[in-house]
């Protein structure tokens, strides 16, 4: 059975409402489907409401150097509302090349796209 366009748009809207926590960490391993959190949580932001384009959710999140540890960050995840310290219901996680040290007055911007496919 295929989820139709209207269904994927509705699922995207449910995700938008319920998954507004974005957390960063400095873990490096690949993401497994059974994963429930970041490898090494460092900071999170709540109330991060994505924009929906069709059935794609787009999160634009900024972290300042003061929010990023000296070890840098190399993983980011989207969590269900109510998540604390990167432990909760994980929607999606990705790893990337470590940012390295970020000056406290600088900002690192992330754009995360989550596609609800049919």
Regions found by a protein language model. Give the residues of each.
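Small cysteine-rich, disulfide-bonded extracellular modules of the LU/uPAR three-finger superfamily
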Residues: 1-74, 81-118
């Amino acid at each position: 059975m295929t989820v139709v366009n209207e269904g994927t748009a509705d699922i995207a809207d449910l995700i938008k409402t319920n998954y507004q926590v974005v957390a960063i960490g400095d873990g490096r391993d690949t993401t497994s489907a059974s994963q429930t959190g970041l490898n090494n949580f460092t900071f999170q932001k709540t109330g991060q409401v994505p924009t929906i384009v069709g059935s794609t959710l787009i999160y634009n999140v900024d972290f300042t150097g003061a929010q990023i540890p000296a070890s840098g960050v190399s993983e980011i995840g989207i969590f269900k509302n109510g998540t604390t310290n990167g432990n909760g219901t994980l929607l999606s996680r990705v790893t990337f090349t470590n940012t390295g040290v970020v000056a406290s007055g600088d900002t690192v911007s992330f754009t995360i796209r989550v596609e609800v496919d049919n």
